[in-house]
A protein has these predicted regions:
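Domain-level signal for soluble alpha/beta catalytic cores
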Residues: 1-455
Length: 455
């Protein structure tokens, strides 16, 4: 509730809230102090809108590093004075833009703005980076990747800086762009998130079942920062109805559902945090069930489990110009009508996964693959399999796919392993592994198993 507290402290309309870190740091420090004195163990920097794209609104885009480092400094000063055991989470909020194909921003441009902010926060000395209030899984993927890269570049590990991914869900239990909690969790866990959670939009009672859904697919720590109830518009003012006394007990079901880190978002005053802290510390949470690892792929909206314990899955392989002269020519002409029709026909026929191959002779696969991912991710809920041997085409597909894709495929050859494995790890993809080496399939079962194990 930094924004609400800043408004109460005199934030004027049109003034950048994050500029307080530089021009009025004593105001920010006082806000931090109030939360620390009321039970906060982690405080969040005043940097929710301190990425370059957001600071452009105030013509401050050239001061990203200065503002973020100043924010960490004032938070650390408050901790040193009021609660030395507390830790600092560097806040990175949404850019306010949508990525292609929902909007006009490229993945790389969103990545770059988060990378710049993450580098500054890490340089300042945060204990966590908290990517929060995100409503689009592609924006989260870009922010997470930027944070991981910034951490690596600084020579840090997750023991030094943990990365928290917090989505914001609507009353229907999905993000505004349609992603449910289990799908969102699967995607960011595969990419390397350290903590996964929810903040904003909803109150504790509405968020509890969503935390349960997250806990059903991961063993990672879970964070939760609800609003002080569902927002209400009273006399043209947004009001959050839960009192401090009411909110504390309502957080206990969230803890029992699996949340490790709990706090508050909009409308939560220092008194709310004190109520939450007292309730949680006096409560013995239920033991969280251990989740057995599973192979899961997703689209933006749908989760699909693979394995010997599931039904046989059908992969539709019509989206492939090999041996299809008409499709190949249409792709040369820039037409994706047949691609989209093939996708819909295969889904209607029962395909569980759609294989996407853009290998047209004499053409660069990369722009074709990018266009195919944009078109298909907007058209069908069915998860996609990326079918290419071209590393550039594979990367553009994995980067722009709003889910956890399946890569088709990797084999036992060194070149295949060194090209495909790093991309799968970076973008959190699942792998279809073929027990083939030097173009040959071993005749004996034990040789195939040995090759698979080596992969």
């Amino acid at each position: 509730a930094m924004g609400t507290m800043l408004q109460a402290a005199g934030l004027e309309e049109g003034y950048c809230p994050e500029l307080f870190n530089v021009e009025k740091p004593e105001v920010v420090k006082n806000i931090h102090a109030q939360y620390l004195q009321h039970g906060s163990d982690v405080i969040t920097t005043n940097t929710f809108g301190a990425c370059g794209l957001k600071l452009e609104d105030y013509d401050l885009q050239d001061r990203v590093r200065e503002i973020n480092i100043a924010a960490v400094k004032v938070a650390k000063e408050a901790i040193a004075e009021f609660k030395p055991s507390a830790r600092v989470a560097g806040s990175m909020g949404p850019t306010g833009r949508f990525l292609q194909p929902l909007g006009n921003m490229s993945f790389d441009s969103i990545y770059d703005t988060y990378r710049e902010q993450a580098e500054a926060l890490i340089e300042g000395g945060v204990d966590f980076i908290i990517i929060e209030t995100i409503i689009d899984v592609q924006e989260m993927r870009a922010a997470l990747l930027a944070s991981l890269d910034a951490r690596d570049a600084a020579g840090k590990t997750k023991e030094d800086v943990q990365i928290i991914c917090q989505f914001s869900f609507s009353e229907d239990g999905r993000t505004i762009t349609g992603t449910p909690p289990a799908v969102a969790t699967t995607i960011v866990e595969a990419m390397g998130a350290d903590i996964i959670g929810i903040n904003c939009s909803l109150g504790p009672e509405q968020i509890t079942p969503l935390i349960e859904e997250i806990a059903s697919v991961t063993n990672l720590p879970i964070s939760c920062q609800p609003n002080a109830g569902m927002p209400q518009l009273i006399n043209k003012q947004t009001v959050f109805p839960l009192t401090a006394e009411e909110m504390g007990p309502l957080m206990l079901p969230i803890v029992d559902a699996g949340a490790t880190y709990v706090g508050g978002c909009c409308g939560t005053t220092p008194a709310h945090i004190q109520s939450i802290s007292e309730a949680v510390k006096a409560h013995t949470p239920k033991e969280r069930a251990h989740i057995e690892p599973k192979t899961i792929i997703t689209s933006r909206t749908k989760l699909l489990e693979l394995g010997h314990h599931t039904k046989p899955l059908i992969i539709g392989e019509r989206i492939n110009p090999t041996g299809r002269k008409i499709l190949a020519q249409e792709l040369r002409d820039g037409s994706f009508i047949r691609v989209k029709r093939d996708a819909l026909d295969q889904v209607e026929a029962g395909a569980d996964i759609l294989d996407v191959n853009m290998g047209v002779a004499g053409m660069d696969q990369t722009p074709l693959m990018e266009r195919a991912i944009f078109e298909l991710s907007m058209l069908v809920e069915t998860p996609l399999s990326i079918d290419t041997l071209d590393p550039a085409a594979m990367e553009v597909a994995l980067k722009n796919y709003p889910g956890r894709a399946l890569i088709n495929s990797v084999n036992g050859e060194e070149e295949s392993i060194t090209q495909v494995m790093p991309l799968a790890k970076r973008y959190g993809a699942a792998l279809l592994c073929l027990p083939i080496c030097s173009g040959d399939l071993p005749e004996k079962a034990e040789d195939r198993v040995a090759l698979a194990e080596s992969i």
